[in-house]
């Protein structure tokens, strides 16, 4: 009988790393993925501080993950294995070091957790590994700006919104109590999802996001006039208080002529402006108060940034459950031989979104999801904001109130502020029921026959059974 000799091959490991900024739910992904891998006999390694060390060829910053040390971390914010914004795509040598380091650690399965920059890095690592390492990405950001299908949020967003709403709720009470305005600048990068989510949920006086401006660049003066107009409108109702939520992404869209204050602003490893370092709220406060003085008006304004206090909050149950699904599916996808995809849960089912399908053909990077200002979600939020609209300028009585508050004529008020309403993308939500014709459900149009104990469609009944037609003697 022929003998078969087999070589003993060391079992391959699965590695997990976290890039970008913190978001509630990271630990739940780590926990779920680790437990799923270990149950299948796979050893799991936590790569500390994202790509920071392995892109330099240093494999000493590793934490062995097991059921004992991850089974309860899902309750907590932060990252059990640290986090970093280090960018391995800046230099091919860094990418080569990442792949080599993982191979030295006997890793053939990699789970990355992060936002659009980390997703791009994961895609580059997968390409360079050429099948030696299978890679899957779990989308994470409080900004909610990854290109997932409509209605599906990135993990961490719901918790960040929840915490942000509680902060704004307290500011709204403080504003009313002390007769002042708060200008709250919310994190969110280029998109306005977080600012709008907080503002709409809390019922803030108004929320301004970059997506509402159709023009490529936004004039600082226009932002100032929107805020001044809202304050005047509020004052006309004898309310000297309010809370304005401002998306930090507005900064990147400002006219270059208004960007002198950004010349020395620090950028991160992915060349993004550190928007949280821009004192945007204070800049707007200064200009708004200066404009109000021209009308003989005065407002106490306090500028506040929110973002850092949201990122490491303990996740709410929604994000704990959601990230458990994401972590499980990420590990299972790799165990089953999957590769090169971003994890998503759509209509309760796992759907891999392959890297090649989520790349923007123009930027060659992962696509960024912006707020759809044509959606009823946005249009309804605008309906509850207090800011100057075209309707205001069509109502002579309201217009007279605003002009009187500003101490100028109706014509002067119109000339000064109408342009901000004229160029506005907002429109009344169209919920006319005629847009939604009723569908006939055949089951509803049925009755049960007592004689036969069977369902008989109305259309099949005889005239005397329906009460229609003449009875014959």
Label every PLM stretch briefly.
Residues 13-16, 73-85, 140-152, 177-179, ...:
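Gly-rich Lys/Arg/Thr-decorated short loops/hinges at beta-loop-alpha junctions or inter-strand turns
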Residues 19-21, 42, 47-52, 85-86, ...:
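Short, ordered loop/turn segments at secondary-structure junctions
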Residues 44, 101, 109-114, 120-124, ...:
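Accessory alpha-helical/coil subdomains and C-terminal extensions
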Residues 259-473:
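C-terminal non-catalytic interaction/assembly regions of soluble proteins
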